UniProtKB/Swiss-Prot annotation:
The lineage of its organism: Bacteria, Pseudomonadati, Pseudomonadota, Gammaproteobacteria, Alteromonadales. The keyword Metal-binding applies. This is Succinate--CoA ligase [ADP-forming] subunit beta. It comes from Shewanella piezotolerans (strain WP3 / JCM 13877). Its EC number is 6.2.1.5. Its cofactor is Mg(2+).
Length: 388
């Protein structure tokens, strides 16, 4: 689960971190009034969506004219903002953040992630602020400095100072940076973050550290113990298909290929996507129907997969353990009839009564191809997708 910038900054403020005075506004009139309340003669107005790249897409404006603020809000509220991180539909803009303008002397980067390699929270800092960190990691990885947080001792001030020295901070800035570092580390643990980015973390003209942006991702598995964070969820930013799938306890992630995938088990689902890629195909989704591949769940899975107009063929890869493959085959046939599937469906069944399940599929009068192996299934579904 992701947070909006204004939500991230409200958390920053709670932990005593330096952020700009700002207000999240629902209407153009509120945006104008917010500028008046903030005061000054320059403001920054930003569309609030979860995707990055807002500035390049016209979703951020610096202005000294309140009527320009009104026009900006009227133009964007209720519309979708398309950036390089969204699909072609973009994400809806329901709020505009109005902030005081900050004079910037230098831009830095500060972020933290849960690192699988070290099994620790790892903080990353760089002098290359305002640039996508992925670009920095690829082109100049030596400019990214790291601090690994030991879960037994927690974050230590010396780690902040070490990063600060590498960023070239002055003694005064070092103290401010240490406060930011320690606050973010505590926040990361308190609220079960999975990702945290301040890009850019700026040094103002007065020489002070300031959090100019904020991006936060929460570990979805920990939301049960984060009631305050749950209330911040904005369902309008979620992929509609992913949200629909969650209602039926289906794990679905939309991708940009043309081969729909329906599998029981996350590991098998990832392996299925890999073998589709290996044979020249492009998966259109990740979809794990879970352990109970019932007719109802399979039918909903088909509906979700086929709501993507790019899907030209569907690969169903089911391992029958507790559930018999012949029962799964009957469920697939029933679901295909109910949904009215019009693209080729390749089914690979393995496990209990697999031969009987393949026989049931072969005897159906539907456009269902029973594969003999996972390799055969991948080859057939890629061929079917290419012929469409």
């Amino acid at each position: 689960m992701n947070l909006h910038e204004y939500q991230a900054k409200s958390l920053f403020a709670e932990y005593g971190l330096p952020v700009s005075e700002g207000f999240a506004c629902d209407t153009a009139q509120e945006a104008v009034e917010a500028a008046g309340h903030i005061g000054g003669d320059m403001w920054v107005v930003k569309c609030q969506v979860h995707a990055g790249g807002r500035g390049k897409a016209g979703g951020v404006k610096v202005t000294g004219d309140k009527e320009e603020i009104r026009a900006f809000a009227e133009n964007w509220l209720g519309k979708n903002l398309v950036t390089y991180q969204t699909d072609e539909k973009g994400q809806p803009v329901a709020k505009i953040l109005v902030e005081s303008c900050t004079d910037i002397a230098n831009e830095l980067y500060l972020g933290a992630v849960v690192d699988r390699a070290t099994q620790r929270v790892v903080f990353m800092a760089s002098t290359e602020g305002g640039v996508e960190i992925e670009t920095v990691a690829e082109e100049t990885p030596e400019l990214i400095h790291k601090a690994i947080i030991d879960p037994l001792t927690g974050p230590q001030p010396y780690q902040a100072r070490d990063l600060g020295f590498k960023l070239g901070l002055t003694p005064t800035q070092m103290k401010q940076f240490t406060k930011v570092f320690m606050g973010l580390a505590k926040m990361f643990e308190d609220h079960d973050f999975a990702l945290l980015e301040i890009n850019p973390l700026v040094i103002t003209d007065e020489g002070n550290i300031h959090c100019l942006d904020g991006k936060i991702g929460i570990d979805g598995n920990a939301l049960f113990r984060q009631p305050k964070i749950r209330e911040m969820h904005d369902p309008s930013q979620d992929d509609a298909r992913e949200a629909h799938a969650a209602k039926f306890e289906l794990n679905y992630v939309a991708l940009d290929g043309n081969v729909g995938c329906m599998v029981n088990g996350a590991g098998l689902a990832m392996g299925t996507m890999d073998i589709v890629n290996l044979h020249g195909g492009k998966p259109a989704n990740f979809l794990d129907v879970g352990g109970g591949a019932t007719k109802e769940r399979v039918a909903e899975a088909f509906k979700i997969i086929l709501s993507d107009s790019n899907v030209k063929a569907v690969l169903v890869n089911i391992f029958g353990g507790i559930v018999r493959c012949d029962m799964i085959a009957e469920g697939i046939i029933g679901a295909v009839k109910e949904v009215g599937v019009e693209v080729p469906v390749v089914v690979r069944l393995e496990g209990t009564n697999a031969d009987l399940g393949r026989e049931v599929l072969a005897n159906s009068d539907l456009d269902i191809i029973a594969a003999t192996s996972l390799t055969d299934a991948a080859e057939q579904v890629v061929k079917a997708a290419e012929s469409k």
